[in-house]
Design a protein with these regions (language model features):
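Non-catalytic, usually N-terminal nucleic-acid engagement modules in DNA/RNA processing proteins
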Residues: 1-93
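Catalytic cores of enzyme domains
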Residues: 84-85, 90-263
Length: 263
């Protein structure tokens, strides 16, 4: 496809409700740092990981293959500002309002692409173990930002206060330019000091352990177990919503502490 089509896709993504959008090559995404490190990370269970029909965690080696004909991947981001916390409130089996918005954005954008550009598209599950991808890595490859000291995607426009989804495209699209953007180099990292469980206090990963030089939180100082413990506590402190489902309000202190993208 011509560059004109890529520009059309990114413009259409915003018309369909995305705050940001970018394009990456499937081959590049499949070799992203998280994909390379995944099999070396040990136990990957916890809050937000998928389970089967018997409520058992799905083994991380069980990763469905993407369609062979898929050549490109579109990443869409939705701004999640501090004054709209409800976008991220988990409400039982229905997930979060923000994720439902992203699903609809991807669906309508896919329909537009198939009609206007005559190319096939394929939905992606949120979970890697069910055919999804590591969305932060994909977003970096799609030119949306960089991975910060808080192990989150940092965008120039909104900092880490975005939520992501993606889908696959049969067409071989030109990827969006990678961003020359690194706001963390001279930052005192308030995201780390504000963490209530000090999940980013001490390095727990090395490049040798994970088989990639790009390790979590840049220097390996991201303890997923501690972060997961905070999320478990958030679940225990959840409130019952109008639908009688527990409404979980997960910690976002490291997001709010980040100065990037603030007015």
């Amino acid at each position: 496809m011509s560059l004109h089509n890529e520009q059309q896709i990114l413009a259409a993504a915003k018309e369909h409700g995305a705050s940001l959008a970018g394009i990456a090559r499937v081959a590049d995404v499949g070799q992203s740092p998280s994909h390379l490190a995944f099999e070396n990370m040990g136990d990957y269970t916890g809050v937000g990981t998928p389970r089967d029909d018997k409520k058992q965690h799905i083994p991380q080696e069980v990763v469905p293959a993407w369609p062979e004909e898929a050549r490109s991947l579109v990443v869409v981001a939705l701004e999640h500002p501090r004054n709209k916390p409800e976008l991220d409130w988990w409400d039982g089996n229905k997930g979060t309002p923000g994720n439902r918005q992203l699903i609809q954005i991807c669906k309508s954008l896919r329909q537009w692409m198939e009609s206007a550009l005559n190319t096939s598209t394929f939905p992606m599950h949120y979970f890697v173990q069910k055919g999804g991808t590591f969305l932060k890595d994909a977003a970096v490859l799609a030119g949306l930002g960089c991975i910060g000291s808080n192990n989150q995607l940092i965008t120039p426009e909104y900092g880490p206060r975005v939520r992501l989804r993606s889908f696959l495209v049969q067409a071989d699209l030109e990827p969006s330019p990678r961003m020359d953007f690194d706001p963390c180099t001279d930052c005192p990292a308030p995201c780390r000091t504000v963490c209530p469980v000090q999940a980013m206090h001490t390095p727990v990963w090395t490049p040798e352990q994970l088989g990639t030089k790009n390790i979590p939180a840049r220097d390996g100082a991201y303890d997923r177990g501690l972060c997961n413990g905070q999320m478990e506590a958030d679940i225990q402190n959840s409130e019952t919503s109008d639908t009688d489902q527990p409404q979980v309000k997960y910690c976002r202190k490291c997001e709010f502490a980040c100065p990037v993208g603030k007015p």
